[in-house]
Design a protein with these regions (language model features):
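Carboxylate- and glycine-rich phosphate/diphosphate-binding segment that chelates Mg2+/Mn2+
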Residues: 1-40
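Residues on a specific face of well-ordered alpha-helices
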Residues: 2-5, 9, 50, 66-70
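Short alpha-helical scaffolding segments that buttress acidic/His motifs in well-ordered protein cores
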Residues: 3-4, 26-34, 68, 113, ...
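A general structural signal for well-ordered alpha-helical segments in protein cores
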Residues: 4, 45, 64-65, 85, ...
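Short, structured helix-loop boundary elements
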Residues: 23, 103-106, 158
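Glycine-rich phosphate/pyrophosphate-binding beta-alpha loops
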Residues: 31-64, 146-151
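Gly/Pro-rich interdomain helix-loop hinge
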Residues: 55-135
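Short, amphipathic C-terminal "tail helix"
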Residues: 132-169
Length: 169
C-alpha cells in the first residue's frame, strides 16, 4: 500500500520537475513494490507486457503502464479484487470509495491510474508502440505460457488475452 501512496504522491514531480526528493521517494516505492511482488508474484499485466517487449521492443515499464488500466478492468470483475481496489482507494485519499459499488470502484481506480500516466506523458494505447491486431493471436499464445500468468487473481484464456490486447489498442 505504501508503494502505491508514494507513486501517486511523487511520480509527477519526479518525472516532470526532476524533483530530487520525489525521485528518491520513487526509488523507495520501487523497493517496497519489489518486496511485495517477490512475495506474492505478478499477474497478466506482466505476461502481456513481456510480449510487447519481445515483439515490439517496448520497454517493460512502459508496456505495463499502457496495459494496466485494461487489465485492472478485467481483474476488477473478481469481487475480491474489486474489494482490494476499494481498500487501496480509501488508503490513497478516496474514502468515498467505501460506499461505491464495485463497478464505480473499478472505474474510479482505472481513471486515477490513467490520469497519473497521462500526467507524465505515457502513451495510452499499444498501437502507439507498434502493436498490430494481426499479431494478437501470437501475443496471446506467448502470454498463455508466461510465468507471471499463474499469479493473476482471475483465470484468463487465450481469447481473453486477445480481447485485452484489442481493448488496449
Amino acid at each position: 500500500m505504501r508503494a502505491i501512496e508514494l507513486i501517486f504522491e511523487n511520480l509527477p514531480a519526479a518525472v516532470n520537475e526532476k524533483n530530487q526528493d520525489a525521485i528518491d521517494k520513487m526509488g523507495l516505492a520501487q523497493y517496497i513494490a519489489g518486496m511485495g511482488f517477490s512475495n506474492v508474484g505478478l499477474g497478466i499485466v506482466h505476461s502481456m507486457a513481456h510480449q510487447l517487449g519481445a515483439v515490439y521492443d517496448t520497454p517493460h515499464g512502459l508496456a505495463n503502464a499502457i496495459l494496466l488500466p485494461t487489465v485492472m478492468r478485467f481483474n476488477g470483475q473478481d469481487p475480491a479484487t474489486a474489494q482490494r481496489f476499494r481498500e487501496i482507494l480509501c488508503e490513497i485519499g478516496r474514502p468515498d470509495a467505501a460506499h461505491l459499488n464495485d463497478q464505480d470502484v473499478i472505474n474510479t481506480f482505472v481513471w486515477m491510474i490513467s490520469e497519473l500516466s497521462k500526467s507524465v506523458g505515457i502513451t495510452q494505447t499499444i498501437k502507439d508502440v507498434g502493436a498490430k491486431e494481426e499479431d494478437f493471436g501470437m501475443l496471446a499464445d506467448k502470454a498463455m505460457e508466461d510465468p507471471c500468468k499463474p499469479g493473476n487473481p482471475r483465470e484468463v484464456s487465450r481469447e481473453d488475452f486477445i480481447e485485452l490486447y484489442r481493448q488496449a489498442m
